[in-house]
From Swiss-Prot:
Start and end residues of each AGC-kinase C-terminal domain: 847-890
Chain segments carrying region Disordered: 324-353, 412-434, 517-541, 559-592, 609-628
Compositional bias (Polar residues): 576-592
Gene Ontology CC annotation, any one: cytoplasm
Official protein name in the record: Serine/threonine-protein kinase greatwall
Comp. bias (Basic and acidic residues): 412-425
Record's comment on post-translational modification: Phosphorylation at Thr-752 by CDK1 during M phase activates its kinase activity. Maximum phosphorylation occurs in prometaphase.
Native source organism of the sequence: Xenopus tropicalis (Western clawed frog)
EC annotation from Swiss-Prot or TrEMBL: 2.7.11.1
Domain Protein kinase: 33-846
Length: 890
C-alpha cells in the first residue's frame, strides 16, 4: 500500500481528484511476510509460520507449488480451496485473510491456531473421553452444517484437518479436496455478503486489500524462468493456451489502413521443444525488430511476428524496440532491399522475385496456403490464420534467406540432387549477422516436397488446424478428410485424483462384487464388475503404474510400426464383432489382466498428447499414481483413432464373443462397458508419428477400469455406409450414448482411505452425506483411538468400508449404548438415511450440548504453548507420520 497523488486522469486506475492524497487499496505482496519456521506438510503443500513485517502479527501460510498442481491435475482443487475458505465466515472454520501468488507458488494466508491439530492431540491422549469427543464432534457438526448450507462439501474430513484454537475450540481447515457449487469465479459481492452468525464480530470483516486478493484469478502458466527441471507437464500446460498456435484474429473492419496482424504467444511458449530458440543470438532477442515497411499494404508486411511467436516473445515487447536500436546486420542495405523488393513485387509467381517472396513467406507469413502457394484473403485482410509456419525452419536460414540474390535463388531452384554440392556459397558482408561468420551453416532449401515430407514426420505448427495426413498419406485414406475448425482444449491428463493418499480406482472393481447386501440400489451406477480375485490379487491394480507418457521414444515407435499391421487380416470380422458387442451385456466385455504394466509399453501416445499432438517432449514425465487409472483410457482412445482396420487380436475376439464368467453373469443389471471406435477416424493408422497402436500381443490382457469412463463418451458405432465428399469437416466429439442410469457427475475418488464413504467407492454421485460419514468415522476414532475400518492396505480398508465391518470394542472397553448408536446412524450405508445435524441434536449422546452457545463453552483441552511461535502441538502427528518439516524450501 502506498500514498499517491492524482495529478492527471491518465495514470491508469487513478482518477482525477483535486490534489488530494488517498490510499489505493491493493493486496500485499508475499515479500511483506517473513518465514519464522515450518509447521507441517501435507500431500499438496507445506504450511509455514510467518510474521507480517509491518505489524509482527503471526499467520499460517500454506504454500502450494503451481507446477505440482498442474502435474497432479489439481488446479481446480486449489481454486476450490481458496473459494471455500473465502466464502466461509464461521467460528468453527479457519479464517482466510489473503490469497497471494508468485510466478511459481500460491500462498494462502490464514490465521495461526497454536493448539495444533486434533490428530496430534489424539496421538498424545491415545483416545478421548466421551465428553471430550462429544464436544469436538458437536463443533465439527456445526461447521459441516454451515458449509453445506453454503454449498460447500469438505470431502476430506479427518482429525488431521481439525485445528485447535487458543481457547481449545475446533476449526476446520484444508479444503483442498472440497467441492464448491459456485460455478463461476468469486466476485466482490460473494465475499462481502457472505452470511455468518446472527451478530457477526469484527473478526470476520475483511479489508479492501483482503477482498481484492481473494477474488484475484490464480494463474498457472508459470514463466519460463520458474520452471522446475524434469517436469514435462509444466511445459505442456503452458502450451495449452495459445503457445502452440498463433492467435486467430479476424479483421473487424474491411479497411486496410490501421489494421495489423497481431500474433500472440505467451512467454510459456519458450517451453516448446520444436522452437528454434538456440538459433537466436542475444542481439536478435534484444532487438526483435520486425521486417516491416508499411502497414498500408498487406503484402508488404514481411514481419517477424511468426518467428517471434515461435520464440515465445510477447507482443507487449514489440513496441519497445526501435529501428535505430537494431544491430547493423538488420539495418543493412541487403535486408532493406530484400524487404522493399518483396513489398514492391507484383510479378507472377514464376518470376524470381515472386519466388523469393513465396519462399520467404513460407518461413514468415502465417497467411500462406502451402498447398497452393497462394495467399488467401490478402485483398481485404479478412482471412483467418488457416496455416501456421513450420517450426522446423531455423532462424539462421530465415535471416540468410533474406540475403539471397535472385540469381542464386533461381540457380538453387534448378539444381538437382547431384548438383547441390556445387551451390555457390553466400558471400558474407560486414553487415551480416554474427552467426554467419563461420560459414558452417548451409542454406536451407525451401522445397515444397521436403516441406510436405516433414509434415508427415512430425506434427508442426503447419498442421495444427488440419488433418496430419491430408497431403502425405492421401492415397492411404479411404474416408473423409477432416479439418480442425477450432482449437480443442486438452483433456486432463488423468481421471483419478491426487489425494491426501492417492487412490487408484482400478482395484475397487473387485470390492464392488462383495457389496450386494448393502448396495441394492446401484443397478446402473457401476460401469463394470470384474471377475473376483483373491485377497492377494486385490492390489494388482497397482501394477498399472507405468506412465503412458514415458513411451514416446524411438524404440516404442519402431515397435508400434511392427505391430501396426498385425491385425489387418481379420479386419471385417473384427468390425462385425465390435458391432455385435455393442448390443451385448457387461458380461461379454469381461476381460482379466495380470501383466498390463509390461504390455502397455506399446502405447506411445497418451490421452494428453492426443489433445495437442505437437508435444513430443512429454516422454520424460515421472510416473504418478494418477496415471494408473488412465491405462484403459489410452487403449480405448487408440482403438477409437484406428480407421478401417482391426486392432483387437483373435484371442481378445474369442474372449469377447465367449459366454461370460459366472461371477459376471450374477449382475445382469449392470451397465455394460462398451468401447468406442470410429471407422471414419481422421487419424490414419499407418502414420507412426500420430497416436500409435496397442501391442497386438497385449490386447488380450486389457483390464477394463471402472474409473475411466467419466470424461470420454463411449459407444460402439458401425462403419459409415457412405463415403463423404472431400469437403473438410471439423473434429467433433462423439455424442454421449449411455445405457442404464446416468453416470455420476464426478467419478473422481476423493479423500483419505479410512474416511471415504461407500458411495465414493461405488462410483455413485455424492453429496454432503460423505462428510457425515467421515464424522462418524472420526467419532469412533475419538472414542477408541483407531479408525473403524483401518487395515494394513488400502484395498482391505475399502473392503471393510463396503462390508461395513466395524470392530466394536468389547468387555471393559465397550462403548456406551448412546455412543454406539450415534456411530451407527452416522455410518449408514444408505446415504439418504444417514444422520445429519438435526438428527445429532435430537440424539441422546448430545443431550447436554448447548448448540446455540457452543463457541463460548469451556473446552476440555486448552493449549499452553511456551511462546507465540511454539509449534510443539503439531509435532506429534508429524512424528507419527514420519514427516520432517525442518526444511525451508518453497
Amino acid at each position: 500500500m502506498g500514498v499517491v497523488v492524482a495529478e492527471t486522469s491518465q495514470n491508469g486506475d487513478i482518477s482525477l481528484l483535486s490534489e488530494k492524497k488517498f490510499t489505493v487499496p491493493q493486496p500485499p505482496s508475499i515479500e511483506e511476510f517473513s518465514i519464522v519456521k515450518p509447521i507441517s506438510r501435507g500431500a499438496f503443500g507445506k504450511v509455514y509460520l510467518a510474521r507480517r513485517k509491518n505489524n509482527n502479527k503471526l499467520f499460517a501460510v500454506k504454500v502450494v507449488k503451481k507446477a505440482d498442481m498442474i502435474n497432479k491435475n489439481m488446479v481446480q482443487q486449489v481454486q476450490a480451496e481458496r473459494d471455500a475458505l473465502a466464502l466461509s465466515k464461521s467460528p468453527f472454520i479457519v479464517h482466510l485473510y489473503y490469497s497471494l501468488q508468485s510466478a511459481n507458488n500460491i500462498y494462502l494466508i490464514m490465521e495461526y491456531l497454536i493448539g495444533g491439530d486434533v490428530k496430534s492431540l489424539l496421538h498424545i491422549y491415545g483416545y478421548f473421553d466421551e465428553e471430550m469427543a462429544v464436544k469436538y464432534i458437536s463443533e465439527v457438526a456445526l461447521a459441516l452444517d454451515y458449509l453445506h448450507r453454503h454449498g460447500i462439501i469438505h470431502r476430506d474430513l479427518k482429525p488431521d484437518n481439525m485445528l485447535i484454537s487458543n481457547e481449545g475450540h475446533i476449526k476446520l481447515t484444508d479444503f483442498g479436496l472440497s467441492k464448491v457449487t459456485l460455478k463461476r469465479e468469486l466476485s466482490m459481492m460473494d465475499i462481502l455478503t457472505t452470511p455468518s452468525m446472527a451478530k457477526p464480530k469484527r473478526d470476520y470483516s475483511r479489508t479492501p486489500g483482503q477482498v481484492l486478493s481473494l477474488i484475484s484469478s490464480l494463474g498457472f502458466n508459470t514463466p519460463v524462468g520458474g520452471r522446475t527441471q524434469g517436469s514435462i507437464a509444466q511445459q505442456t500446460e503452458g502450451m495449452r493456451g495459445n503457445a502452440s498456435t498463433p492467435l486467430l484474429m479476424k479483421k473487424k473492419e474491411n479497411s486496410v489502413k490501421g489494421n495489423k496482424l497481431m500474433i500472440s504467444c505467451p512467454e510459456a511458449g519458450l517451453s516448446s521443444p520444436s522452437m528454434p530458440v538456440k538459433c537466436l543470438t542475444p542481439n536478435l532477442l534484444k532487438c526483435r525488430t520486425p521486417f516491416t515497411t508499411s502497414s498500408t499494404s498487406s503484402q508488404s508486411r514481411i514481419c517477424l511476428s511468426s518467428l517471434e511467436s515461435e520464440c515465445g516473445m510477447s507482443p507487449r515487447w514489440e513496441n519497445c524496440s526501435q529501428d535505430a536500436e537494431a544491430p547493423p546486420y538488420l539495418n543493412s542495405s541487403r535486408v532493406k532491399d530484400c524487404s522493399s523488393e518483396q513489398a514492391r513485387s507484383k510479378k507472377p509467381m514464376g518470376s524470381s522475385a515472386s519466388q523469393n517472396l513465396k519462399h520467404l513467406e513460407f518461413a514468415f507469413s502465417p497467411i500462406v496456403d502451402r498447398r497452393t502457394g497462394k495467399k488467401a484473403g490478402f485483398q481485404d485482410e479478412t482471412g483467418e490464420l488457416s496455416d501456421t509456419p513450420l517450426a522446423t525452419l531455423g532462424a539462421k536460414g530465415v535471416i540468410r534467406k533474406c540475403l539471397y540474390d535472385n540469381n542464386a535463388q533461381e540457380k538453387h531452384k534448378d539444381l538437382g540432387k547431384d548438383d547441390q554440392g556445387e551451390l555457390e556459397k553466400l558471400t558474407i558482408s560486414p553487415d551480416s549477422p554474427p552467426w554467419l561468420a563461420n560459414g558452417s551453416v548451409a542454406p536451407i532449401q525451401f522445397n515444397d516436397d521436403e516441406i510436405i515430407e516433414k509434415m508427415g514426420i512430425k506434427r508442426n505448427y503447419d498442421l495444427v488446424e488440419k488433418s496430419p495426413e491430408q497431403e502425405v498419406l492421401q492415397d492411404k485414406k479411404t474416408n473423409t478428410d477432416y479439418k480442425r475448425g477450432c482449437t480443442i482444449t486438452g483433456y486432463p491428463v488423468s481421471q483419478s485424483t491426487g489425494l491426501t493418499m492417492e487412490i487408484n480406482s482400478l482395484f475397487l472393481s473387485e470390492l464392488r462384487s462383495s457389496t450386494n447386501n448393502y448396495a441394492s440400489d446401484r443397478k446402473s451406477e457401476d460401469d463394470y464388475i470384474s471377475a473376483p480375485r483373491t485377497h492377494e490379487n486385490l492390489g494388482s491394480g497397482n501394477t498399472i503404474a507405468k506412465n503412458l507418457l514415458c513411451e514416446l521414444d524411438d524404440n516404442c515407435e519402431r515397435d508400434g510400426e511392427a505391430n501396426s499391421n498385425s491385425g489387418c487380416e481379420e479386419g471385417e470380422n473384427q468390425k462385425e464383432s465390435l458391432n455385435q458387442d455393442s448390443e451385448s451385456s457387461s458380461a461379454d466385455m469381461s476381460v482379466t489382466e495380470n501383466q498390463i504394466e509390461r504390455e502397455l509399453c506399446q502405447v506411445d501416445k497418451s490421452i494428453k498428447e492426443l489433445s495437442f499432438e505437437e508435444s513430443p517432449s512429454e516422454s520424460n514425465e515421472e510416473t504418478t499414481p494418477e496415471n494408473k487409472g488412465m491405462a484403459f483410457m489410452a487403449e480405448n482412445d487408440a482403438l477409437k483413432r484406428e480407421p478401417n482396420r482391426s486392432v483387437l487380436p483373435e484371442t481378445l475376439h474369442n474372449v469377447l464373443a465367449s459366454p461370460a464368467p459366472t461371477s459376471a453373469m450374477a449382475h445382469p443389471r449392470r451397465k455394460p462397458m462398451v468401447a468406442f471406435r470410429s471407422y471414419n477416424s481422421p487419424i490414419n493408422g499407418s502414420n507412426l508419428s500420430e497416436p500409435s497402436r496397442i501391442s497386438m500381443n497385449s490386447a488380450d490382457k486389457i483390464h477394463f477400469s471402472l474409473g475411466c469412463t467419466g470424461s470420454f463418451p463411449m459407444a460402439v458405432t458401425p462403419a459409415q455406409k457412405k463415403v463423404q465428399g472431400l469437403t473438410e469437416t471439423p473434429y467433433r466429439t462423439p455424442k454421449t450414448v449411455r445405457r442404464g442410469g446416468l453416470q455420476a457427475e464426478n467419478e473422481r475418488i476423493l479423500g483419505t482411505p479410512d474416511y471415504l464413504a461407500p458411495e465414493l467407492l461405488l462410483g455413485k454421485s455424492h453429496g454432503p452425506a460423505v462428510d457425515w460419514w467421515a464424522l462418524g468415522v472420526c467419532l469412533f476414532e475419538f472414542l477408541t483411538g483407531i479408525p473403524p475400518f483401518n487395515d494394513e492396505t488400502p484395498s482391505q480398508v475399502f473392503q471393510n468400508i463396503l462390508n461395513r465391518d466395524i470392530p466394536w470394542p468389547e468387555e471393559e472397553e465397550t462403548l456406551s449404548v448412546n455412543a454406539q448408536s450415534a456411530i451407527e446412524i452416522l455410518l449408514a450405508i444408505d446415504q439418504t438415511k444417514r444422520a445429519g445435524l438435526k438428527d445429532l441434536k435430537a440424539h441422546h449422546l448430545f443431550h447436554a450440548i448447548e448448540w446455540d452457545d457452543l463457541q463460548n463453552l469451556p473446552m476440555p483441552f486448552i493449549p499452553q504453548p511456551d511462546d507465540e511461535t511454539d509449534t510443539t502441538y503439531f509435532e506429534a502427528r508429524n512424528n507419527a507420520q514420519h514427516l520432517k518439516v525442518s526444511g525451508f524450501s518453497l
